[in-house]
Amino acid sequence: MTASALSKWPTCLACLRRLAQPFGTSAARHGEPRARAVPVIRPIVHTQTRAASHRMRLQDQGVVVRLLEDIPKFGRKHAIFRIERGRMRNEWFPKNKAEYMTPARFQELGLTRDAIGEVDRSFVIMSALEAATRPKPEEQKTEEPVPEVQISQVNVPDVTPETAHALLSELIPNTLTFHREPVPIPISQPKPALEPKISPLIARHVPASTPETPSTGEARRAIFGSVSSSDILNQIKALVSGHEEASRIVLGPSSVKIVGLAEDNDRIRHLGRWEIEIAVARAGGLDPVRKSVEILPSAQ
């Protein structure tokens, strides 16, 4: 079965002209009358064929992106390369793994097109590599257990309360000295009082005025920092550390008490002399060891 002449529409102008002519006749040549036109037998079917184009289409090289995190088999963070548009649009950009590198973005980062690199297929994150090389639980069970080395503990005899009381009384000096920088006292200059005018004969018999002595509050000057019971305890431990038996005495934060301070206060904040009590554990009827602490101004 033959196809009709109009089954396929021609696309060139010459084919349209041939189809527009009547069948059985041909157009007269230039200068010849139409009556002398020579009849020509034309086929009814006109099939137009076109060869397929073998030209290579330009391959889409993808879009330029910049990684915002390490991605295995693609590259490290801040790497710039080309990637498929679909992967960037559907996976990386929604999950904030990469950003588009537009000309404006290149200018913001101070980069040029020369910074565009290649995909690093050999890049592997170390955590993923460690997870891949980590032995499985079944393999860990098959490993032989390493025998534990047992260290024998040496039993050190405890110091009796009576011995501890005697050693602390002997090794600790009567006064423990600490140096702190005192807070300067602002000096206010009083206005000179107007002296009444008296006769020189009377002023000769008036006794000279004596300077005023500082008050008790000025004598107890404040200091920068403070001396706590922990500071006193550390100094006591340093004094007894050289003695073989006294170094085994158990002393804790509650072993030192500063006499004259409130119960919730264990810090000395002024210059002066303070009494302390050193309690011995399990002392029973023994009194605490009494010593003194003196806070002196540090050398300027």
From Swiss-Prot:
SUPFAM superfamilies in the cross-refs: L9 N-domain-like
**Gene3D superfamilies, alphabetically?**
Ribosomal protein L9, N-terminal domain (3.40.5.10)
Which keywords does the record carry? Mitochondrion, Ribonucleoprotein, Ribosomal protein
Does Ribonucleoprotein count among this protein's keywords?
yes
Entry's Gene Ontology molecular function annotations: structural constituent of ribosome
Where does this polypeptide localize? Mitochondrion
Role, per record? Component of the mitochondrial ribosome (mitoribosome), a dedicated translation machinery responsible for the synthesis of mitochondrial genome-encoded proteins, including at least some of the essential transmembrane subunits of the mitochondrial respiratory chain. The mitoribosomes are attached to the mitochondrial inner membrane and translation products are cotranslationally integrated into the membrane.
Q: Which PANTHER family match?
A: 50S RIBOSOMAL PROTEIN L9
The protein, known as: Large ribosomal subunit protein bL9m
| Species of provenance | Neurospora crassa (strain ATCC 24698 / 74-OR23-1A / CBS 708.71 / DSM 1257 / FGSC 987)
For this protein's source organism, the top of the classification is: Eukaryota, Fungi, Dikarya, Ascomycota, Pezizomycotina
